[in-house]
């Protein structure tokens, strides 16, 4: 019974995440989807409820034959030694011209808005945002980024309307 209740709450939260409001948030002009695939370390985020207390968070993408994006989101809960949590949503690229707008599906039929709003030319850093500006993920190909880069991304997020007081740096163990 507890599982059904938790699943229902999670599905409701995801369905609410699918709703968008607020002024448009612009995406990058174009994403080379093959280059975007692979592992991304979550450097900081305005977390969803499942990500609170995440350590060593990594989002991995793989382009499936059907054009969807197989996603694995994993992290340690509560500490570096905490239990490893793994989620496997599927991404649906909804803007085929830019590849910068996706619907991320944790449970059918709900898809959460997923917009690539920042991407460095070398594909080493990215920011995923939402029109509601309720969640955001700063990600990189490495577990840490230079402080100047992080500050530049924070300036960008403030410019596009995010409340930086909600942002949480994700502890990452350097390998």
Where do the model's predicted regions map?
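Bacterial N-terminal signal peptides
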Residues: 7-15
């Amino acid at each position: 019974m507890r599982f059904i209740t938790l699943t229902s709450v999670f599905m409701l939260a995801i369905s609410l995440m699918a709703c968008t409001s607020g002024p448009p948030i612009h995406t990058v002009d174009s994403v080379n989807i093959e280059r975007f695939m692979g592992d991304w370390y979550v450097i900081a985020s305005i977390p969803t409820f499942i990500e609170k207390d995440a350590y060593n968070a990594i989002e991995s993408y793989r382009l499936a034959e059907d054009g969807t994006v197989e996603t694995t989101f994993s992290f340690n809960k509560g500490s570096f030694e905490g239990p490893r949590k793994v989620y496997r949503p599927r991404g649906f690229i909804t803007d085929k011209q830019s590849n910068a707008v996706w619907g991320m599906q944790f449970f059918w039929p709900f898809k959460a808005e997923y917009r690539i709003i920042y991407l460095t030319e070398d594909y080493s850093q990215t920011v995923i945002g939402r029109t509601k500006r309720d969640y955001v993920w700063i990600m990189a190909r490495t577990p840490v980024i230079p402080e100047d880069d992080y500050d530049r991304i924070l300036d960008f997020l403030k410019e596009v309307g995010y409340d930086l007081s909600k942002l949480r740096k994700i502890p990452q163990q350097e390998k």
